Amino acid sequence: MLEVTATSAGIMLFRREEAATEVLLVHPGGPFWARKDNGAWSVPKGQVEDGEEVSACALRELEEEIGSRLGLTAADLMELGSVRQKSGKVVHCWAAERDFDPAELHSETFTMEWPPRSGRQQDFPEVDRAEWFDPDEARRRINPAQAELLDRLLASLDGS
């Protein structure tokens, strides 16, 4: 039987403040993630749809998760490659230099039964918050597999 690998695409936003680089990470919404912090944060990303270009998915997911594409197009994106998360999901990622005010976060929502077996459907945001982190703090907060994407970004910026 052919195994289908889940594939996501996302964008690691970064900004440079004087000599320091910061990256924007998002925290997933919903009750499962409510009390999780270190290792729970992520680049804004989501599932690639059938027939969708991977970079187009990354831009769409940025808008769905933070509420804006920030004027980005595929031409603005710097490829960081892909990583495989513990779940087996492959995450393709790009980087882009843009500023974003986390207070402007407007995420799409999803519906799930909560509490379990209650028969009650509730809406939750895909992302409940976004924050800028310096590289050391980002490394503590980000999904462990995605830390490699952060390292690739920093290496690329050091070489530029």
Where does each model-flagged region fall?
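Functional cleft and adjacent loop/helix regions within the main domain
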Residues: 40-44, 50, 86, 96, ...
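Active-site-adjacent beta-strand/loop module that shapes the phosphate/pyrophosphate-binding cleft
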Residues: 81-119, 131, 153
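Charged phosphate-binding loop/patch that engages nucleotide di/tri-phosphates or the phosphate backbone
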Residues: 131, 135-160
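Alpha-helix-centered segments that form part of catalytic cores
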Residues: 120-136
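Residues that scaffold the ATP/ADP-binding catalytic core of kinase and kinase-like folds
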Residues: 35, 51, 141
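The catalytic Nudix box helix
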Residues: 43-78, 94, 134
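N-terminal strand-loop-strand
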Residues: 1-43, 94
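Short, charged/polar surface micro-motifs in flexible loops or helix N-caps
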Residues: 17-20, 30-33, 49-50, 87-88, ...
